[in-house]
């Protein structure tokens, strides 16, 4: 019995000092960064546009329907997917990104939404600029997030 306890103690202390267990190496930095950068689910809201009477571009977290409606209007179109995405502000909030009016075809695409490890969220998007248009457009992106994912939201553009 004493021999079994001594062998177990030797195995445990060897695990802690070498960082290896049965030929598997544990990289503590990789484990820490993986747990702090947790993917947060979201969905892109379709069928919304930045209202033309908005003075300040809406960028960031919007938790209340009245604040959302002050900046965005609905744009229903024909077809099965023509209705704007439903947003339940009792259980969800949105992250909005918008750019100044342009005469270039411009798409804002979500890249990721992750926890930052300090109780906040980081939303990353990219801008795809295309051909010159004969009219102006206001690029915007709205994503819907469950309210169980709380915290300050930082927005970053992928270059």
Where do the model's predicted regions map?
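Sec-dependent bacterial lipoprotein signal peptides
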Residues: 1-13
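Exposed, flexible binding/inhibitory loops of compact, secreted disulfide-stabilized domains
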Residues: 15-159
